[in-house]
Amino acid sequence: MLGSNTFKNMQRRHTTLREKGRRQAIRGPAYMFNEKGTSLTPEEERFLDSAEYGNIPVVRKMLEESKTLNFNCVDYMGQNALQLAVGNEHLEVTELLLKKENLARVGDALLLAISKGYVRIVEAILSHPAFAQGQRLTLSPLEQELRDDDFYAYDEDGTRFSHDITPIILAAHCQEYEIVHILLLKGARIERPHDYFCKCNECTEKQRKDSFSHSRSRMNAYKGLASAAYLSLSSEDPVLTALELSNELARLANIETEFKNDYRKLSMQCKDFVVGVLDLCRDTEEVEAILNGDVNLQVWSDHHRPSLSRIKLAIKYEVKKFVAHPNCQQQLLTMWYENLSGLRQQSIAVKFLAVFGVSIGLPFLAIAYWIAPCSKLGQTLRSPFMKFVAHAVSFTIFLGLLVVNASDRFEGVKTLPNETFTDYPKQIFRVKTTQFSWTEMLIMKWVLGMIWSECKEIWEEGPREYVLHLWNLLDFGMLSIFVASFTARFMAFLKASEAQLYVDQYVQDVTLHNVSLPPEVAYFTYARDKWWPSDPQIISEGLYAIAVVLSFSRIAYILPANESFGPLQISLGRTVKDIFKFMVIFIMVFVAFMIGMFNLYSYYRGAKYNPAFTTVEESFKTLFWSIFGLSEVISVVLKYDHKFIENIGYVLYGVYNVTMVVVLLNMLIAMINNSYQEIEEDADVEWKFARAKLWLSYFDEGRTLPAPFNLVPSPKSFYYLIMRIKMCLIELCQSKAKRCENDLEMGMLNSKFRKTRYQAGMRNSENLTANSTFSKPTRYQKIMKRLIKRYVLKAQVDRENDEVNEGELKEIKQDISSLRYELLEEKSQATGELADLIQQLSEKFGKNLNKDHLRVNQGKDI
């Protein structure tokens, strides 16, 4: 019984498999396209074949003569005749089909022609009545589908491209300059997507309905906006548009991390476009137009120096190839040696002598500039190179003062920590130690001068721009620590002076050895070993040491000026960034083992051979110095026979050393090596970009004199102050007059005079608007038009010089096929005409022969 059931089950399974195989065989490999609705008549099949292969005579004849032909019929793939003709670049067939009314899927044919770059077919389709209003060019296929029809549909399943792809977006994606120009003239535009965090109803609804489609639509729009074809032809200022768009795309790369690579690629595409336009400049005028923007709207300084707004923007957005481009660097170098044109071609020795001369005569040069800032010498000192040299010399002197201030302790201090030393018997010891020396007084003057310079920079740039530069933060920290150090030192001096005043008033003895003083006074007579840990002088000395370290580290700021040291400084900065990234993992591992080891050994304080791990502080010190091999294994050994605790300590300590030293430190070394290799591979661009940032900080007007010479205001400063006060008073008077006029106009609101005046004002504003609309292009616009024209021509030439690909070979094949059908048609027409002529001749000759035969017969009869 069991065997019979098993046999029946196996037989049923084989029957099922045979039926399934039979169904698959019936469906065949093209089952997906064998739908009932796609059956065609022989006439329709011939019509579609003729449209596909460019048989113009057959298509024309069938469209003109056939009464039953459905010219919107589709093949097995769902394509109609128009789509087949466009896909195979048959212009004449397309023009014949476009003459028919109610032609379907014209929009998809347009998208197909754009994707293949068929310019003439695009022009023919755009002349179709469906595009008369131009509204269809601004709507996406999805919006068209929601409104009325399948205008952009590939088949009944939808469009062949994404639902958000408009013709102008597709043309921009394909870098079709001519098609983009045609669509722009038709009024098509690419709408910039809303901000990523936009909460409007439209964005909220799209995000809720399909977040993926919403993100893809944003990506497609940005691809169109970032294309060189659209940037070149749609914007009045393509350079500014490309720079701002590159920054926006770089910001989106950090926000939409799932599309990070795509956004970074688009951002780099915008940067390459700007570099390409700059590369096409042929003279200084064009380079200045690129670097400064619209020169007619540019605010020039009193000394006729441009603001270099585009370079500042490129540096802010880190468009390094643009800033490091030879055209840009040559212009910056010319401005760098402004008023010193002869020095640029001199040797290094001559330049060194010039720097040495400035170092020696800096005080005298400062006095000369105070007296005559507009003289030839003043103009020379205002040149960026001389400003850089003056500031570098001033800072070098400041560092020298720091060294001199510590020179008296190079061989060790004379007074030990447990000793005191005074100038006279009744002098308080702390009065002598807290007094400021002459070098410290000079250092304070330099610090005040640098603080004033930083305040002016904050005033000119604004706090937001100021904090974006790391060197500004370093300067701010260094100066703040110096101020805190000197403040603490001054507070200690005040307290010591108060103690000295008490001694001078109330102590009558000659010395202070046997005098009983109040505790608050006696404290200032103690040696250093008895000072409180929170003593202001101790805090001052600690802060001063930190400030000195930061001061010497600031030398790296001027290193990019040198070609040899510049790349090293850049590599050092990148290394610091890698260390900060590494610190996240390092701190996580370090804290984990520190807390674990502390919990393990905190109960054994006094029961170990050293105090390691018995407190949090000792745990930190032991683990930190263990990284550098300065901790001993005995740190985990106990005096008691608690082997379990010791074994766990050995294991944890060993795992820590393996993790930190073998794994993490080697990973940090690999990261640093990788960063250095990246800098070395593009060292020239990185160095020139860093040098341009350094140069640009000296191009702005003002801050000519370095610290501490900038503390004394020059006559020019008083003149600028008076002019600024004058402008403020004028603006105040004008605002009051305008307010009074507005009050008067409000009183005459219902009068006839008010109405007449309002109408006259409206007419004047309309005239001004019309004049501004039809005004002549500015010099900057002419230059940009010239450059963009070169860029477009170069792009087209580069595209034509590419190798012939498979698509172009297919186009040639289709053209030959169309030509063959045309020749066959002409041959058939010629053959028909020849047959008609032969028939006519035969008929004519037949009539003549009959007449001759009759004459002969009549003659015989006669």
UniProtKB/Swiss-Prot annotation:
UniProt keyword list: ANK repeat, Calcium, Calcium channel, Calcium transport, Cell membrane, Glycoprotein, Ion channel, Ion transport, Membrane, Nucleus, Phosphoprotein, Repeat, Transmembrane, Transmembrane helix, Transport
Segments passing through the bilayer: 352-372, 384-404, 466-486, 538-558, 582-602, 652-672
Region (Disordered): 1-21
Residue ranges that the UniProt entry lists as topological domain Cytoplasmic: 1-351, 405-465, 559-581, 673-862
One Pfam family recorded for the sequence: Ion_trans
Catalytic activity: Ca(2+)(in) = Ca(2+)(out)
Renumbered ranges of ANK repeats: 42-71, 77-106, 108-134, 163-192
Compositional bias (Basic residues): 10-21
Post-translational modification: Phosphorylation by PRKG1 at Thr-15 negatively regulates TRPC7 activity.
Membrane topology of the entry: Multi-pass membrane protein
GO process terms (BP): calcium ion transport; manganese ion transport
GO cellular component: a single term: plasma membrane
Subunit structure: Interacts with MX1 and RNF24. Interacts (via ANK-repeat domains) with PRKG1.
PANTHER family: SHORT TRANSIENT RECEPTOR POTENTIAL CHANNEL 7, TRANSIENT RECEPTOR POTENTIAL CHANNEL
Function: Forms a receptor-activated non-selective calcium permeant cation channel. Probably is operated by a phosphatidylinositol second messenger system activated by receptor tyrosine kinases or G-protein coupled receptors. Activated by diacylglycerol (DAG). May also be activated by intracellular calcium store depletion.
Family recorded in the similarity comment: Belongs to the transient receptor (TC 1.A.4) family. STrpC subfamily. TRPC7 sub-subfamily.
Protein name in the entry: Short transient receptor potential channel 7
Origin species: Mus musculus (Mouse)
Top-level taxonomy: Eukaryota, Metazoa, Chordata, Craniata, Vertebrata
Gene behind this protein: Trpc7
